[in-house]
Amino acid sequence: MSVRILVVDDDRAVRESLRRSLSFNGYSVELAHDGVEALDMIASDRPDALVLDVMMPRLDGLEVCRQLRGTGDDLPILVLTARDSVSERVAGLDAGADDYLPKPFALEELLARMRALLRRTKPEDAAESMAMRFSDLTLDPVTREVNRGQRRISLTRTEFALLEMLIANPRRVLTRSRILEEVWGFDFPTSGNALEVYVGYLRRKTEADGEPRLIHTVRGVGYVLRETPP
């Protein structure tokens, strides 16, 4: 069963962006638009983790944290806020949040922080089983190790995030805009060839010993991870 995450934010665009990104990475996602709705949903069907905005109507994120912790609930909580100051971070952590991420943020970082939160609440054997595989390509989001057969591949953060998205969606064509939004975040470049450059980097590294190509271009659309060209 996939991990269930409740996303709570009064900004619909943020909610939908997080829903798409988390769903693409294998999570089951539910949405709430404020703290009152979030607490009701948690009480009726507790999720595995919570992504929680601070500034919301009716009941803000910090009060949601306080109420949950006040009942002894240890639900993993990642707090989002538009204010990036020491006092704001301290307030969030003191209210009971496990981690803190200022807006705007790269979706890659949010996904990494969510994995870290879930690792801290799962037994070691569960964390060790998170390796993703396609053909002879293996990517482990916990250890951040990548292998092609027995060959270890060293990747930068952006290369890793791009490959992780592709391997999480095998044989599924991913549009250029979808990849840019998820890997580069909300402020992704709308022009230039950054994506093409990084796809080239990944191809060179994953094919360095003459292995067959796995990352294919779908002309006019985007890219796909598959054994043969589309």
UniProtKB/Swiss-Prot annotation:
Post-translational modification: Phosphorylated and dephosphorylated by MprB.
GO cellular component annotations of the record: cytosol; peptidoglycan-based cell wall; plasma membrane; protein-DNA complex
InterPro entries: CheY-like_superfamily, OmpR/PhoB-type_DNA-bd, Sig_transdc_resp-reg_receiver, WalR-like, WH-like_DNA-bd_sf
Main location: cytoplasm
Induction per the UniProt record: Autoregulated. Differentially up-regulated under different stress conditions, such as low concentrations of detergents and alkaline pH. Induced by low concentrations of sodium dodecyl sulfate (SDS) in a SigE-dependent manner. In strain ATCC 25618 / H37Rv, repressed during growth in macrophages.
PANTHER family: REGULATOR OF RPOS
Role noted for this protein: Member of the two-component regulatory system MprB/MprA which contributes to maintaining a balance among several systems involved in stress resistance and is required for establishment and maintenance of persistent infection in the host. Functions as a transcriptional regulator that recognizes a 19-bp nucleotide motif comprizing two loosely conserved 8-bp direct DNA-binding motif repeats separated by a 3-bp spacer region.
Protein's name in the database: Response regulator MprA
Organism: Mycobacterium tuberculosis (strain ATCC 25618 / H37Rv)
Encoding gene (name): mprA
